[in-house]
């Protein structure tokens, strides 16, 4: 499901930005921000996967003759950046700002990501500058403008299920130990 979410983000940008802002449909890709990705115009990087902790704890349920365990709810955090090193038409600062504005409009208008049969809330992350610097430093890159998005809750299905024996009928026989009287 995680890869499906990432591919859907990528497809949304391609559908909205090509051909007006992208040279070709391969201009948006899932990749880490690095100088060697010169064919990428816009990069989408999943930088964090964490537990979605806002919901109440869910327990296994019985479905027929098996116990089904609940999915794990996760939060996916993305960094979306305009590649300053893009080959064949790298962006000047003005073009870069226009592209960021277009992407902000796309994600603001979208607000919910349709992935398979799920509607997943999509929101911008208001991140402190120190946190942004930390992310970029961990990638060995200087800080640059980027959009930070969160998709949550994303259900990751449990592979665990157990066979249960369900008691459907009980025969109860009792014998009285008292003889006579009360």
Please provide the spans of the model-predicted regions:
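A short, solvent-exposed, low-complexity linear motif enriched for acidic/polar residues
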Residues: 8, 12, 16, 152-154, ...
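Short, charged, low-complexity patches
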Residues: 2, 6, 71, 92-100
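Oligomerization/assembly interface segments of phage tail-like spikes and tubes
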Residues: 70-85, 101, 143-153
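Small/polar-rich, solvent-exposed N-terminal microdomains that initiate assembly or binding
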Residues: 1-60
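Short intrinsically disordered coil segments
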Residues: 59-64, 94-95, 161-173
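Acidic-leaning, charged glycine-interspersed low-complexity segments
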Residues: 98, 104-156
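Short, cationic low-complexity segments
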Residues: 67-71, 105, 165-182
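"Short basic amphipathic alpha-helical interaction patches in structured regions
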Residues: 58-63, 90-101, 118-119
């Amino acid at each position: 499901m995680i890869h499906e979410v990432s591919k859907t983000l990528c497809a949304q940008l391609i559908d909205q930005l090509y051909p007006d802002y992208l040279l070709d449909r391969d201009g948006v890709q899932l990749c880490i921000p690095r100088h060697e990705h010169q064919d990428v115009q816009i990069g989408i990087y999943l930088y964090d996967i964490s537990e979605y902790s806002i919901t109440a704890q869910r327990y296994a349920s019985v479905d027929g003759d098996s116990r089904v365990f609940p999915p794990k709810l996760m939060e996916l955090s993305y960094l979306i950046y305009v590649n300053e090193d893009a080959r064949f038409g790298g962006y000047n600062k003005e073009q870069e700002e226009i592209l960021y504005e277009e992407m902000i409009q796309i994600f603001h208008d979208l607000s919910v990501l349709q992935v398979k049969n799920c509607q997943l809330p999509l929101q911008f992350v208001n991140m402190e500058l120190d946190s942004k610097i930390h992310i970029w430093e961990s990638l060995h890159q200087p800080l640059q403008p980027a959009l930070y998005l969160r998709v949550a809750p994303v259900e990751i299905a449990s592979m665990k299920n157990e066979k249960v024996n369900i008691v459907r009928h009980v025969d109860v026989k009792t014998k009285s130990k008292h003889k006579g009287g009360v």
